[in-house]
Amino acid sequence: MSDDVALPLQFTDAAANKVKSLIADEDNPNLKLRVYITGGGCSGFQYGFTFDDQVNEGDMTIEKQGVGLVVDPMSLQYLVGGSVDYTEGLEGSRFIVTNPNAKSTCGCGSSFSI
């Protein structure tokens, strides 16, 4: 998908830069960052991240700076309007999902409820 099209999920420059760096470390240019939602955590749902070299039927792929973010259709329905970012600070370095659909989140921000 093009950067010019309004996307249901934003993939920030900071996140794309970090993914590019991590993929270079793995020496596998086919890898993409997959973000997904699974049951669990203290609020009912939690975010997960993994590298994947497969894009499954129905997955949405967002390309930015030569790297891809992949989301399965089930997870995407909970992430519409959100963003995937990367931050470095006092709490450490991590990918962060900003999700306008979450009614509440836990203190660490890793789990949420809808």
From Swiss-Prot:
Q: Name one GO molecular function term.
A: 4 iron, 4 sulfur cluster binding
The free-text cofactor remark is: Binds 1 iron-sulfur cluster per subunit.
Q: Which domain of life is it from?
A: Bacteria
Q: Which PROSITE patterns match?
A: HESB
One biological-process term from Gene Ontology? iron-sulfur cluster assembly
NCBIfam families from the xrefs? iron-sulfur cluster assembly accessory protein (TIGR00049), PRK13623.1 (NF010147)
- Tell me, how does this one assemble? Homodimer.
The family classification in the record reads: Belongs to the HesB/IscA family.
Name of the molecule in the record: Iron-sulfur cluster insertion protein ErpA
